[in-house]
């Protein structure tokens, strides 16, 4: 095997945008990784998920086609018979 071809595997501190920090090991130089989200603040792990409306597409759809009620389809089908 060739010597000195593998990067060093060192202790690294991961810092999240929420302020949470934890230690891990990585080959990234500098010993510090900055992350936007972690398991302490990510909506999937915290259970505080939100539906993101990208660019108002849901509102645009509702304006165009109207907001249907749950029983409206059944009432319409019964009226057609």
From Swiss-Prot:
Alphabetical keyword list: Metal-binding, Ribonucleoprotein, Ribosomal protein, RNA-binding, rRNA-binding, Zinc
Record carries keyword Protein biosynthesis: no
Cofactor dependence: Zn(2+)
An MF annotation (GO) of this entry: metal ion binding
GO biological process: translation
Binding annotation for Zn(2+): 16, 18, 38, 41
InterPro entries in the record: Ribosomal_bL28/bL31-like_sf, Ribosomal_bL31, Ribosomal_bL31_A, Ribosomal_bL31_sf
Transmembrane residue ranges: none
Bound cofactor: record note: Binds 1 zinc ion per subunit.
Family from the record: Belongs to the bacterial ribosomal protein bL31 family. Type A subfamily.
Reported function: Binds the 23S rRNA.
Assembly information from the UniProt record: Part of the 50S ribosomal subunit.
Name this protein carries in UniProt: Large ribosomal subunit protein bL31
Gene: rpmE
């Amino acid at each position: 095997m060739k010597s000195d071809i593998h990067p060093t595997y060192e202790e690294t501190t991961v810092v999240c945008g929420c302020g949470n920090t934890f230690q891990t090991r990585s080959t990234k130089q500098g010993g510090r990784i900055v992350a936007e989200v972690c398991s302490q603040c990510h909506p999937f792990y915290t259970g505080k998920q939100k539906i993101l409306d990208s660019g108002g597409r849901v509102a645009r759809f509702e304006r165009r086609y109207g907001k249907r009620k749950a029983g409206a389809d059944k009432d319409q089908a019964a009226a057609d018979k």
